[in-house]
């Protein structure tokens, strides 16, 4: 779900900081200001995770996905005939009563002016919350089962909320997404075989009671109180019938105000936190426009840690859109690191690999190819919408293969028009992990490739353009600007050097190994072909064609300039839509990724065509969203010709 300050785009950076500085055998990782838990979920595969957030709705998400190590079986509900709780909660009939708090206060019911939800969706949320409370009170569900079901509801609510980013305000007119029906999607729970623990406390109080090895601190940066932006999710989670006020129906939050959002208090609060932290390794995320200055943070860290271990890492900050403009060059996201003179914990590290139930939401494999338009950040929304049983999966515009690598099918056919991309992926499929890594490291040594050696990079680029070996291309990309594919009209690789940014880092190596291992486990065939030349006659009703074509109305260029050396235009779009109509007439399932609107533009052709199929609205952006987010930005969708995901 979207959350201000989400660190989804910094996970690789955090991983690299840990790999560079944590050389001992750390076991316990704590995420002290967890938010929606994206960091804790990411590191659950490696450590025992302690997570905390002062907001109750965040705590529920953490308890469900981090503390919980398995998908609940709801044994008591099954005894009374409720075998599928989500189906029951979505479809059971009810009548609106005086207890339906959201219906009466946040939907246009009985004269209420607030338009956060339609009456249908608000009343369904109310029914679910009242039902969960009743089940819990009657001991039909335990604490973890309650958290699991409530977390599913919390994650589903933003998809049908009539807002532009947060709950600081509702829209005056109904957004198309808000008119859809509330859908409950299962959570995928990773089992790391540790006793993970979740807290719902003030960070400065909790820090005196916990201990571990790695402490990750991501406090609020400025004066905006998170509770005002997420008050409605907090009310849904607590369902405590608060005395709301104001046009937007805010809940009282004076006692919930964070010290980190108050200029006079933030310095003392942060100093207390670092002083009392009983952790050997400390990482702090912060922003160059935060209330604390870089020098203040450095001084506090060095005063309580080992000064010689202090490090600071600066990343360009993709600021969410605001009324207050600043030059992008002035904005940075920081990761601070320091080590304290504290012994490691004595917990025994588990040798078991993490096991993930159902769809691998927090364990999706990410392609090692940085291909513009890649769907890795949307996989946890797209993959659950695929049928459970697929014979042949066709990834018609496979690009970096982010989607195909994460699909369970008896056979996967990945096609793309870009010869070079297909050759790289096919070579990885046919070559052992050891050989791939050895080849890359040999080239790095031969040409002295590094973040600073531009001459070595240029020499290697010249060598590649003469030989065109696929693994050399991948190695070259690792040291290129933004890790991108880019060729000129003579089919020569011409992406410039990625000075001080791009390298074959330990994190990238790990990503590559995981990708190749997954690739070797699947029955994959890579094909270089234009989409209209694919042999669709070989498909039947047990197959699925997934399409992620270039988007007709977006202005962003693809890695090679035209996504595979060919422009995408209205004629190409019509060809593809005709093919999908033909597949539908033959009973073959399809799923199309696209955007209906983008920065004020609408794809009228797609809008009209899609009316005869099912449209699933996706959360396009996960990070740095706020109530100032501009309406009309990309409305990402998945269009399918089926509704039942289990075949």
Curated annotation (Swiss-Prot):
Entries under InterPro entries matching the protein: Ade-mod_methylase_MStsI, Ade_MeTrfase_dom_2, DNA_methylase_N6_adenine_CS, MeTrfase_D12, SAM-dependent_MTases_sf
Pfam family, one: MethyltransfD12
An annotated Gene Ontology molecular function: sequence-specific DNA binding
Signal peptide: none
Result, substituting residue 548 to A: Methylates only 5'-CATCC-3' strand. Loss of methylation
Positions of short motif Adenine-specific methylase 1: 218-221
A single BP term in Gene Ontology: methylation
Keywords: DNA-binding, Methyltransferase, Repeat, Restriction system, S-adenosyl-L-methionine, Transferase
Reaction(s) catalysed (UniProt annotation): a 2'-deoxyadenosine in DNA + S-adenosyl-L-methionine = an N(6)-methyl-2'-deoxyadenosine in DNA + S-adenosyl-L-homocysteine + H(+)
Motif (Adenine-specific methylase 2): 548-551
UniProt KW DNA-binding keyword: yes
Outcome reported for the amino acid change (mutating residue 218 to G): Methylates only 5'-GGATG-3' strand. Loss of methylation
EC assignment: 2.1.1.72
Enzyme's top EC category: transferase
DNA-binding recorded as keyword: yes
Disulphide connectivity of cysteines: none
Domain description: The 2 adenine-specific methylase motifs of the protein participate in modification of the two strands; the first motif modifies the sequence 5'-GGATG-3', the second motif modifies the sequence 5'-CATCC-5'.
Subunit structure: Monomer.
UniProt similarity note: Belongs to the N(4)/N(6)-methyltransferase family.
Protein name, UniProt field: Type II methyltransferase M.FokI
Provenance organism: Planomicrobium okeanokoites
Organism taxonomic ancestry: Bacteria, Bacillati, Bacillota, Bacilli, Bacillales
